[in-house]
């Protein structure tokens, strides 16, 4: 029985996005015996798509989003509609590596109580050039009291952890809340802080399982750094970091607003 759902949020399928979508589907098809695919997006993008035209290998479900189509809201809607024991988040311009499932099976045996398992993420630029790796620090000698485990205490000091590509127990996330779409920049950081604060066990997999395109032009985090409409200054970036450290005590989002002094 397939017990993992891959949630793929989509806001556009024109031009280069269609090429990204095709690569993302091929990435998931490697694991067609183990996973199902859940697409989330607006009706004008996904409304005319036929399941059998997407993949002849995967079990595909489509959820039409009639509300906010921002990344957090799309993922949250996918989680609400997830019925498997586990889920993972795949960004449209990213890919899983061939050992993604195998390494999960191996390290879930090592960490049987884990509610979340995060693979090492290979960060590349839009040309595919290696930039760095993420999520690997927890295996450094002496970094964590329990090697391989990511605690709330560690997260309060270290913020750079990637949530896409990881494995999440659906029941635990539904119980503790998903992404808060009103938090800019640090929404995934607040998410991990909240989960670990509430007792969720997070372990990391010391193998590369996910390839992430970092700061692709027009991506959300690119816009925070470069867009005239969404660019964040140093003061606002610091504000959202501190906000994450205050808001993780609360399951539901509260009103938060940055005021430029």
Where are the predicted features?
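Conserved nucleotide-sugar donor-binding
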Residues: 83-84, 162-176
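Short, flexible, basic/aromatic active-site loop/helix in glycosyltransferases
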Residues: 136-158
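Conserved donor NDP-sugar-binding/catalytic core segment of glycosyltransferases
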Residues: 101-133
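Short aromatic/hydrophobic "clamp" motif used to bind/position activated sugar donors
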Residues: 87
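Short, acidic, metal-binding catalytic loop of nucleotide-sugar glycosyltransferases
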Residues: 23-35
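Glycine-rich, basic loop-to-helix element that forms the pyrophosphate-binding segment
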Residues: 65-82
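Acidic donor-binding loop at a coil-to-helix junction in glycosyltransferase catalytic cores
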Residues: 184-191
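Nucleotide-sugar-dependent glycosyltransferase catalytic core
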Residues: 69, 129-135, 182-184, 197-201, ...
């Amino acid at each position: 029985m397939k017990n993992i759902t891959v949630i793929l949020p989509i806001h556009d399928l024109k031009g280069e996005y269609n090429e990204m979508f095709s690569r993302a589907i091929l990435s998931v098809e490697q694991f067609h015996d183990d996973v199902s695919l859940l697409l989330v997006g607006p009706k004008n993008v996904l409304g005319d798509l036929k399941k059998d035209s997407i993949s002849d290998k995967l079990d595909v479900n489509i959820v039409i989003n009639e509300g906010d189509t921002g990344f957090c809201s799309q993922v949250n809607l996918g989680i609400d509609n997830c019925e498997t024991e586990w889920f993972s988040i795949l960004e449209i311009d990213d890919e899983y590596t061939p050992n993604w499932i195998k390494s999960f099976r191996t390290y879930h045996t090592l960490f049987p109580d884990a509610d979340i398992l995060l693979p090492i993420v290979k960060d590349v630029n839009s040309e595919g050039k290696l930039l760095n790796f993420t999520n690997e620090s927890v295996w450094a000698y002496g970094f964590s009291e329990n090697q391989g485990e990511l605690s709330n205490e560690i997260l309060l000091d270290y913020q750079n952890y990637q949530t896409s590509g990881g494995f999440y127990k659906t029941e635990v996330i539904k119980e503790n809340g998903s992404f808060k779409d009103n938090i800019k920049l640090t929404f995934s950081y607040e998410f991990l802080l909240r989960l670990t604060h509430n007792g969720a066990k997070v372990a990391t997999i010391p193998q590369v399982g996910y390839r992430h395109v970092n700061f692709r032009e027009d991506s959300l985090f690119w816009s925070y750094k470069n867009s005239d409409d969404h660019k964040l200054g140093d003061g606002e970036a610091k504000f959202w970091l501190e906000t994450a450290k205050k808001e993780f005590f609360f399951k539901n989002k509260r009103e938060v607003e940055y005021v430029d002094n």
